[in-house]
Amino acid sequence: MENRPALKPEQQQVFEKLCIQLPEIMRSEFPDVPDHDHYTNAGAIGRFAAAHEYKTETVIAKWKAWVQWRSTYKPHEISETEETIEKQTESGKLRWYKYDKEKRPCLYYRMRFHTLGLATPDETVRFFIYMLEKGLKEAEKLGQTKIVVVYDRRGYDKSNQDPKSIDAGKQLTPLLQDYYPERLHCFYVIGANWFYRMMFNIVKTFVSKKTLEKIAILGSTEDLLDTFNKEDLLIEYGGVTEGDQKFAEKVKKSKRNGADEGDESEDETELRKLADNIYKNHGVEPPKLTDGM
C-alpha cells in the first residue's frame, strides 16, 4: 500500500470535516449519481484535499466539479471497442507495461508512434482518459493510487509533426489536474532536445507548478534503473523483456523502433518553422535559439 505523508493537525482537522461534509453534499446535490462511495471514500477526499492545500472552500468546489464531470463524461465507460480508441491503441503511442519499484503502473508515451491526422484533439483527449482509467484500475489492484509516465521523444521526426498536439494538450491538462489530482508520481522525459525545450515553454503556461515539479528529464534510459527493476522494463529502456508477443511483433516491424533512431537534426528547419507557428498561434514569444541548443 502506498505510504501517505503524515498530516499536520490542522490538515487532519480539515480532512475529517470534509469526510463528513462531502458525503452530505453528495446525497443532497447528486442523489442520482451512482456509486457514491467512489466520490466520497477517504482516498478520493484525501487526494482533493492534498491537491488544493486543504483549503476547504476550494476543495469542495473542485470536488463538486469532478462529480459533475465524471457523471456526465463517464470516463469509466469508455470502451476499447470504440473506433477512435481502437485505432489509437493500434498506433502503439501509449502503452501500459508493468511498474516502477514501488509498484506504480507505468505508461509509455512514445512520440515516434504519433500519427498525423489519426485523431482530432477531442479524440486524443478521450483516448488519454481511457488509458488513464485503465492504469488507475491496475494501480488499485497493486495497492497504489499513483502512476508514472515515460515520455519518449526519440525517433520523432517530420512525419510526426502535428501542430494540433499542443491544442490536445491544452484540453487534456486541465482535465488531468482538476479531475485526477494526486495521481501522477513522476513524468520521465527521454530525448529532451531543443524542440522539446521550445514546446515546453508553451506547455508550462498551462501546467500547474505542482505538476511541473513532477517532470524529470533523463540523460539516458539507464537513469530509469534508479526507479525501475530491470526485469520490469522493456528492452529498449534498459530492461530484459519485449513484453507481450503481439506488441513485440508490432515494434519489431516498425521503422521507428529502438534507441538508435536518429535525432531531429535532419528536420531542424521544418521543426523551427513549426515551432514558430505554434508560438504565434498561442501568443507566446519564442526564445532566441542558438546553434547547438
Describe each region flagged by the PLM.
Residues 1-293:
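Basic, amphipathic alpha-helical/coil surface patches used to engage anionic, phosphate-bearing ligands
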